């Protein structure tokens, strides 16, 4: 199906372009959301009359989006999650969690504006893109940590692996346990008791 785009659509085209798309994409996405018109002679005339108004609205929306983009560009949001010692999350950080973090900072963004290919499943600092307007994208970072202190350490660039500390603690525990057990004892055999 051929459609006339009423706004810029990512990976498809600019406003006013005549593009060929699959029927389902046009019927289920572009037409219901007002992003395109069927490419008929009547709609082409209608578009020519609406063109100036659409361009003015697009410029106004882009200006507003630029203000929001300046506010969030390079911003860092922190998401606290439970995770294993190796840094794997028990669950994941999704678009919904990122939006909630921005809401906590007073910035309203929509789910469709956060460009996250797959949920975040590890602790650390992750860079994501936010498309506040089809023509305006900004990069923000999401810090995923087990606690606020750990998030501060990650943001400072410190190594958060605690393996060395854990190994030292385990060695101390083994040394302390050695005082209570006979190292020469055979497992599976009961030692005779003296009576």
Curated annotation (Swiss-Prot):
Q: Does the keyword Transferase apply?
A: no
Q: Which residues form the signal peptide?
A: none
Question: What GO biological process, any one, is recorded here?
Answer: translation
List keywords of the entry alphabetically.
Answer: Ribonucleoprotein, Ribosomal protein, RNA-binding, rRNA-binding
Q: Which GO terms describe its cellular component?
A: ribonucleoprotein complex; ribosome
List, alphabetically, the Pfam families matched. Answer: Ribosomal_L9_C, Ribosomal_L9_N
KW Ribonucleoprotein (keyword) present:
yes
Question: Would you identify the family this protein belongs to, as annotated?
Answer: Belongs to the bacterial ribosomal protein bL9 family.
Descriptive protein name: Large ribosomal subunit protein bL9
């Amino acid at each position: 199906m051929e459609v006339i785009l009423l706004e810029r659509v990512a990976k498809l085209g600019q406003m006013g372009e005549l593009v060929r798309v699959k029927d389902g994409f046009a019927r289920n996405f572009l037409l219901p959301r007002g992003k395109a018109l069927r490419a008929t002679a009547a709609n082409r005339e209608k578009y020519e009359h609406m063109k100036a108004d659409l361009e003015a609205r697009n410029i106004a929306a882009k200006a507003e989006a630029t203000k929001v983009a300046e506010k969030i560009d390079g911003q860092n949001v922190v998401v606290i999650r439970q995770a294993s010692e190796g840094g794997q999350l028990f669950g994941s950080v999704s678009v919904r969690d990122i939006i909630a973090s921005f809401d906590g900072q007073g910035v309203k963004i929509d789910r469709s504006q956060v460009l996250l290919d797959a949920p975040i499943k590890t602790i650390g600092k992750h860079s994501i893109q936010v498309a506040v307007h089809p023509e305006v994208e900004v990069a923000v970072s999401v810090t995923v940590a087990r606690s606020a202190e750990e998030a501060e350490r990650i943001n400072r660039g410190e190594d958060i692996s605690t393996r060395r500390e854990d190994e030292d603690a385990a060695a101390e525990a083994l040394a302390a346990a050695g005082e209570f057990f006979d190292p020469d004892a055979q497992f599976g055999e009961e030692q005779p008791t003296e009576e």
